[in-house]
Design a protein with these regions (language model features):
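Primarily marks hydrophobic transmembrane alpha-helices of the MFS/SLC 12-helix fold
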Residues: 53, 270-273
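Cytoplasmic helix-loop-helix junction between adjacent transmembrane helices
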Residues: 80-119
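Conserved MFS/SLC helix-loop-helix module at the cytosolic interface between two early adjacent transmembrane helices
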Residues: 33-71
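Juxtamembrane intracellular "pre-TM" segments in multi-pass secondary transporters
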Residues: 160-199
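C-terminal ends and interior cores of transmembrane alpha-helices
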Residues: 58-71, 277-291
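Helix-loop junctions on the cytosolic side of multi-pass membrane transporters
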Residues: 144, 149-172, 379-390
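Transmembrane alpha-helices of Major Facilitator/SLC transporters
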Residues: 32-35, 238-262
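Helix-loop boundary and gating motifs at the non-cytosolic
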Residues: 1-34, 194-244
């Protein structure tokens, strides 16, 4: 999150990207994710989760650092696409690696505890990058990229991988045939399970909504709402302070959430997920319509907190439905691909609304698009949050 904050301010304040260009950044990224999400998930399932994670962090770090070194909107959009390709190597691979190492039954609490540790790292990184941005916003963007690149080096050097085992050499086919077989098995696994289909469709609408908020939030605050008059506090200081407050609240909220979902039923996990998504919808709608900075700031904090809790809960529920470890990363990537389709398809339309009718209209449309996702998650609860008994997946 710290690098996202300084990058989002950098492209609005220093590079002066238009609403359409801001959304096109996300569209390019999500188009890349759509094309590469499943293939890279298949690589993680076929070859190595660790290798996939290392490639992803190295690529994301390099792309972020390069954004701080260019000034052309076209170059920034292209680098965002490169970031998206790199991200797909981490999407699904991390959760699949963790499930293999500790078991699915321990995955939920581990993801939440990991999120809690992540809040600490986010706060430390936020303080460092915001402090650096007071000297040079461009330097803080480059530094954030280099830190992400360093994570890739650490993963390659020190991350264990004992739970994942490749097929014996005698059972392997040609590389492309082996990848195609894994992809086909993952797709069949999703199609055969009603609940997984509902989760994937929900991600489609969630992606459309998040694209509007993620790309237009800071522009709305800077151009429509306006920052309080405080000569000593720049935009990065305000956004950094908001991020820090959300991080502190998130740290304590995750502790409460761990106690709520640990050793609880799948239905309880599903209930928490639906509630968090409803909170995100309400807060995004308030943010889109208000003009007071204080109310907008509270809405930003609520969205940030709810979404940070939503991610590990969603992954817990999704992984509870995946009973075949050999396609785990692929199935997670299919869900991620649905999110990417939503962002790539909805982004240009919402950006055009912003250009024609203003940022408030675009953000309102983005919030309303989230309603079908809430409805689909609610429908999934009719299955008690668990997949009904089905016939075994055909070979």
């Amino acid at each position: 999150m710290p690098t996202w904050i300084v990058v989002s301010v950098y492209v609005v304040r220093d590079l002066h990207l238009s609403p359409l260009q801001l959304v096109l950044m996300g569209t390019a990224m999500e188009a890349a994710v759509f094309l590469c999400e499943v293939p890279t998930g298949v690589i993680a399932d076929t070859y190595s989760r660790k290798l996939s994670l290392a490639i992803g962090f190295l690529g994301m770090g390099a792309a972020w650092a390069a954004v701080g070194l260019v000034s052309s909107p076209t170059a920034v959009i292209a680098l965002w696409a490169a970031w998206g390709v790199s991200y797909t190597f981490t999407s699904g691979a991390y959760q699949a690696w963790l499930a293999d190492e500790i078991g699915v039954e321990s995955l939920g609490p581990a993801l939440l505890r990991g999120a809690r540790i992540g809040f600490v790292g986010t706060l430390l990184g936020l303080v460092a990058l915001v402090a650096l941005s007071t000297v040079s916003l461009q330097a803080s963007v480059v530094a954030g990229g280099m830190l992400t690149f360093a994570c890739g080096v650490l993963v390659a050097a020190f991350m264990p991988e004992e739970g994942f085992t490749r097929k014996p050499r005698a059972e392997r086919g040609r590389p492309w045939a082996e990848l195609a077989q894994t992809a086909s098995a993952g797709a069949r696994f999703v199609r055969a399970r009603t609940l997984l289909v509902l989760l994937v469709v929900s991600e489609l609408f969630a992606g459309m909504s998040s694209e509007a908020y993620d790309r237009l939030r800071d522009a709305h605050v800077l151009r429509d709402v306006g920052l309080p008059h405080a000569p000593s506090l720049g935009a990065t200081m305000w956004f950094g302070a908001a991020g820090a407050v959300a991080t502190v609240f998130g740290f304590f909220a995750v502790g409460v959430l761990i106690r709520r979902v640990e050793h609880r039923s799948t239905r309880e996990v599903a209930r928490v997920l639906v509630a968090l998504l409803a909170v995100v919808f309400a807060a995004e709608l308030v943010f889109a319509r208000v003009g007071a900075f204080g109310v907008a700031l509270v809405a930003i904090l609520v969205v940030s907190l709810a979404r940070s809790l939503l991610a590990p809960v969603y992954m817990t529920w999704l992984n509870q439905q995946i009973t075949d470890s050999s396609v785990r990363a692929t199935v997670i990537s299919i869900a991620g691909q649905a999110d990417a389709v939503g962002q790539a398809a909805g982004g240009p339309a919402i950006g055009a609304i912003g250009n024609a009718f203003g940022l408030r209209a675009a953000l309102t449309a983005g919030a309303l698009v989230l309603l079908p996702a809430v409805g689909f998650y609610g429908r999934a609860l009719k299955h008690d949050g668990r997949e009904p008994e089905l016939e075994a997946l055909p070979a």
